[in-house]
């Protein structure tokens, strides 16, 4: 039996930020594209190289947060294969400084092999350099941290943008796919329902931000998060503050909604 065209391999880095761990993907059987090789953990690096069976030809990253791209440099040097992705527009402490792409992937770029075609889709929001990858033959979208299973994603200002994030979610409606392979968690079906739910959830949260702001003459983000995210475990409020501030920094207008 031939192996699946898309293999998901989860890194052993589970945490409150990463859920069960960061998902790496091996695309293809004979001409493999490795997507999001993950954190620099020897066990995970060795597993990916072993599963690749000497057939990994290139490495893509969805974005350069430190749970997604640090292994790219290591594996790229071991296998002598090129790194492809984008660099951030506004640097912050979340970024992997070791990622230096040989090729900058633009919106709509295609990588074509005898087995599959990958389309690069620029989806800023979670990070300014975030990309999703459509595997056309499988009608599958690799979403990195644009969409996760089990949690909504953190939008951390200044590199993260709530306005860009919502526009990028709406952009996915233009593509034909029936399965989401996320950066964290298991695959998701009925993708348009997932996209619509996330957009609605974020807009409802924004309404709550505006409503709660009216109750204060002066308030800090740390105080405001308690009422805006009162449905979220208080242990997660320090993380939720990032998304709260992204709502506060966001202009009102959206392009695609």
Q: Model-flagged regions — what are they?
A:
Residues 2-51, 132-144, 149:
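Conserved beta-strand hairpin/beta-sheet module of binuclear metal-dependent hydrolase folds
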Residues 15-20, 39-117, 139:
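Active-site HxH/HxHxD metal-binding segment of metal-dependent hydrolases
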Residues 34, 39-40, 117-208, 212:
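Metallo-beta-lactamase
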Residues 230-242:
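Short, positively charged loop/turn segments that connect secondary-structure elements
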Residues 245-249:
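Short, hydrophobic-biased segments on the C-terminal half of alpha helices
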Residues 255-256:
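Conserved small/polar residues in nucleotide/adenosyl-binding loops
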């Amino acid at each position: 039996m031939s192996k699946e065209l898309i293999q998901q391999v989860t890194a052993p880095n589970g945490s409150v930020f990463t859920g069960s761990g960061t998902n790496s993907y091996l695309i293809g059987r004979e001409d493999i594209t490795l997507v999001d090789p993950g954190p620099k953990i020897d066990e995970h690096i060795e597993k990916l190289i072993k599963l690749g069976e000497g057939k990994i030809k290139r490495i893509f990253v969805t974005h350069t947060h430190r749970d997604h791209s640090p292994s790219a440099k290591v594996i790229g040097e071991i296998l002598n294969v090129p790194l492809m992705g984008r660099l951030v527009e506004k640097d912050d402490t979340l970024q992997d400084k070791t990622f230096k792409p040989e090729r900058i992937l633009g919106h709509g770029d295609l990588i074509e092999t005898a087995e599959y075609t990958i389309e690069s889709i620029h989806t800023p929001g979670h990070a300014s350099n975030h990309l999703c990858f459509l595997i056309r033959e499988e009608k599958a979208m690799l979403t990195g941290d644009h969409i996760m299973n089990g949690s909504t994603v953190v939008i951390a200002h200044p590199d993260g943008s709530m306005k860009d994030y919502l526009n990028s979610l709406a952009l996915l409606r233009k593509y034909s796919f029936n399965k989401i392979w996320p950066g964290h968690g298991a695959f998701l079906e009925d993708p348009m329902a997932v996209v619509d739910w996330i957009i609605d959830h974020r807009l409802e949260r924004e309404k709550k931000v505006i409503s709660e702001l009216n109750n204060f003459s002066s308030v800090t983000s740390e105080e405001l998060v308690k009422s805006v995210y009162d449905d979220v475990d208080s242990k997660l409020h320090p993380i939720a503050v990032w998304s709260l501030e992204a709502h506060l920094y966001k202009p009102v207008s959206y392009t695609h909604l």
